[in-house]
Amino acid sequence: MAGSSGTNGQGFFTTRVDTFLNWARSNSLMPMPMGLACCAIEMMGFAGPKYDSARFGSEAMRFSPRQADLMIVAGWCSYKMSHAIRRVWDQMGDPKWCIAMGACASTGGMHRCYGVVQGVDNFLPVDVYISGCPPRPESVLHALMDIQEKIRNEYSVVQDYEFGKARERAPIMPENTNRFPGQLEKPKTSTLTLEAPDADDAEEASTPEPVAA
C-alpha cells in the first residue's frame, strides 16, 4: 500500500478501497495447476519447501476451479485438451489471471504439428509468459511477482463492480471470432469426395454416340 496510503499521526492508515483489496488479493493468490507435460515437474518444484512460495501467499494449490484465481498452464496443449482447459477457465470466478509456463504453452515449442495448439493464448487470455524448456522454478516465482504487480497497479475492483470490466476479457482468437469461445479451428485436410452418378447420367454415358460414315 506504499504510495497510496499514509498515517495521519493517530495510529491508523488512510487508503483507498482499490488499494487495500488489491494488496490483499495479490498476496493470497490460489493457483490452479494445469500440468500437461514436463513443465509440470518444475511447477512441483516451485510449490515445494525449497522455494517457499508461501512467502507470496500462493503455497496452496487449488484443484477446483471454484476456489482458484490463477491458472498455470504448463506444457504443450493439444486441440482436444484445449476444450477441457477452456471449460475449467470458464468455471473460475472473476477476477482471474493466467500464466503460460514454458515454450510449448507460449508458442507451441518444438511441437509444430497439426494436433498441437501453437500457444494457449489462442483460447485463453494470458497475462504472463515464461520462456524456457522447461523453465526453472525461479522463473515461476518471477512470473508470480509479475502477476502481483499487475494486480496492484492495473486491476480496479471499483470498475469491475461498476462496469463489469472482468467479463470483457474475451479469449484471443483472431481467426475464429465467429465461433463459440474455446472452440478452435480444426486442422484443414485435403479430402476428395466421389459422388455416384445418377441413373440418367449413367445411361447417357453407356449409350455410344453415332459415328458419321
Swiss-Prot record:
Keywords: 4Fe-4S, Cell inner membrane, Cell membrane, Iron, Iron-sulfur, Membrane, Metal-binding, NAD, Quinone, Translocase, Transport. Pfam families: Oxidored_q6. It is found in: Cell inner membrane. It is a peripheral membrane protein. One of its GO terms (biological process) is electron transport coupled proton transport. It catalyses: a quinone + NADH + 5 H(+)(in) = a quinol + NAD(+) + 4 H(+)(out). One of its GO terms (molecular function) is NADH dehydrogenase (ubiquinone) activity. Its EC number is 7.1.1.-. Residues 172-213 are annotated as: Disordered. One of its GO terms (cellular component) is respiratory chain complex I. Residues 197-206 have a biased composition (Acidic residues). InterPro entries: NADH_UbQ_OxRdtase-like_20kDa, NADH_UQ_OxRdtase_20Kd_su. It comes from the Bacteria. NDH-1 shuttles electrons from NADH, via FMN and iron-sulfur (Fe-S) centers, to quinones in the respiratory chain. The immediate electron acceptor for the enzyme in this species is believed to be a menaquinone. Couples the redox reaction to proton translocation (for every two electrons transferred, four hydrogen ions are translocated across the cytoplasmic membrane), and thus conserves the redox energy in a proton gradient. HAMAP family: NDH1_NuoB (MF_01356). Belongs to the complex I 20 kDa subunit family. NDH-1 is composed of 14 different subunits. Subunits NuoB, C, D, E, F, and G constitute the peripheral sector of the complex. This is NADH-quinone oxidoreductase subunit B. The gene is nuoB.
